[in-house]
Amino acid sequence: MAGRNQNRTASLAGIQASGHVHTFGNCTDNDMLEEDAEVYELRSRGKEKVRRSTSRDRLDDIVILTKDIQEGDTLNAVALQYCCTVADIKRVNNLISDQDFFALRSIKIPVKRFSSLTETLHPLKGRQVLHPPPVPYFQEQDTVPANDSPSSSESAGSFLKEVDRDIEQIVKCTDTKKENLNEVVSALTAQQVRFEPDNKSVHRKDPYYGADWGMGWWTAVVIMLIVGIITPVFYLLYYEILAKVDVSHHSTVDSSHLHPGLTPPSHHREMGNAIGPTKGIPVGQQDDHRLYRQDPQARD
């Protein structure tokens, strides 16, 4: 037990020397025994290292500019003018409240190293001294365009003249004065038709659809008329003509039976060939038969 207590006291003394464990006067040996004597030193992990490195990089990227405070300047106005936050200005100038700003003659402003402000003001490399020579921002801003004022004014004047010419041409091209409403409507419709091809893409019609064999609606209508009207009409006419021919044939046959003296042209042909019209009897014998039929009483 004595050796174990000596080892624990030695380890605790080493820990106290490192500054990680604080002992209190009320602590006893029993309390120290209950607690875990093995205490390890915590090391910073990757995220904390990255945070520290990023914070250092941010501090290195910041450049401090000084500006003389003039009448009408406020803390918010300076922050808006130099694109920074009020908290950053307070932190750099050790300001507790906004009222402390009015007690200063010059103010330090944190600005990023690579920005438009650093390019225009030409600050010193790195951080400046606590009291550097003041840089008149407004005077330099006035002097920079003063060197190029003639060329800039000439270019601006020429640009404005060109704009005026373009406006005059547009006004001449678009004459809005119309005498009648019809002219207004025609002008608006012409403009609408002019702008329609730009907005709408022209879809090319495919002449072959597959199901209708590439036929249009008018060809379908013509086919329906032919099938539904013209074909039945021709059919009826054909059968009417056939019926008339049959009726005329039957009428000629009936007339030949009713009037035996009238011989049809076929009988005349048979007589010309010396053949009887009925049973192939010669003409002389036919006369004898006629005489026999005409005088039956004479024979009696």
Curated annotation (Swiss-Prot):
Which residue ranges run through the membrane?
217-237
Q: Where are the compositionally biased (Basic and acidic residues) regions? A: 286-300
GO CC, alphabetical: Golgi apparatus; Golgi membrane; plasma membrane
Q: Spell out the Pfam families in the cross-references.
A: LysM
Where is it mostly found? membrane
Phosphoserine (modified residue): where?
Answer: 55
Domain LysM, first and last residues per copy: 65-109
* Glycosites: 7, 26, 199
Q: Where in the cell is it found?
A: Cell membrane; Golgi apparatus
Q: What is one GO biological process annotated to this record?
A: Golgi organization
Bias category Polar residues: which stretches? 140-156
Protein name stated in the entry? LysM and putative peptidoglycan-binding domain-containing protein 3
Species of origin: Rattus norvegicus
Highest lineage ranks of the organism?
Eukaryota, Metazoa, Chordata, Craniata, Vertebrata
